[in-house]
Amino acid sequence: MSNLLKIVEQDYLAVQKALPEFKAGDTINVHVKIKEGAKERIQQYQGLVIQKRNSGNGASFTVRKISAGIAVERIFPTMSPFIDKIEVLRAGAVRRARLFYLRDKTGKNARIKEKKKPVVEAAK
């Protein structure tokens, strides 16, 4: 049975959507398809990635945002057909894979420094 699952997973991973590389600590904008009756629209969910689970087709990531002073966390399956696209807005400089300690912090204490990018000198 496990061999059959591996074969099916390989087929799905071969046709996997081209998603950008991101990790815990990055600020991302997820475009989610929302169905309301017969209509379908796209809603943007912007927040901080606090964890990323990589396990084949069961991969998922958790995004945390503050909305009207209330923290909201949402778990997105990576292979979900409801995800239209993902944009990486900022790369955070963190040393952990799971940022659950941010749940206890508020305001300025919950900020994450931005990762420094290497300076490219102009060609003369």
Curated annotation (Swiss-Prot):
<dbReference type="InterPro" id="IPR001857">
    <property type="entry name" value="Ribosomal_bL19"/>
</dbReference>
<keyword id="KW-0687">Ribonucleoprotein</keyword>
<comment type="function">
    <text>This protein is located at the 30S-50S ribosomal subunit interface and may play a role in the structure and function of the aminoacyl-tRNA binding site.</text>
</comment>
<dbReference type="InterPro" id="IPR008991">
    <property type="entry name" value="Translation_prot_SH3-like_sf"/>
</dbReference>
<dbReference type="GO" id="GO:0022625">
    <property type="term" value="C:cytosolic large ribosomal subunit"/>
</dbReference>
<comment type="similarity">
    <text>Belongs to the bacterial ribosomal protein bL19 family.</text>
</comment>
<dbReference type="Pfam" id="PF01245">
    <property type="entry name" value="Ribosomal_L19"/>
</dbReference>
<protein>
    <recommendedName>
        <fullName>Large ribosomal subunit protein bL19</fullName>
    </recommendedName>
</protein>
<dbReference type="GO" id="GO:0006412">
    <property type="term" value="P:translation"/>
</dbReference>
<keyword id="KW-0689">Ribosomal protein</keyword>
<dbReference type="GO" id="GO:0003735">
    <property type="term" value="F:structural constituent of ribosome"/>
</dbReference>
<dbReference type="InterPro" id="IPR018257">
    <property type="entry name" value="Ribosomal_bL19_CS"/>
</dbReference>
<dbReference type="InterPro" id="IPR038657">
    <property type="entry name" value="Ribosomal_bL19_sf"/>
</dbReference>
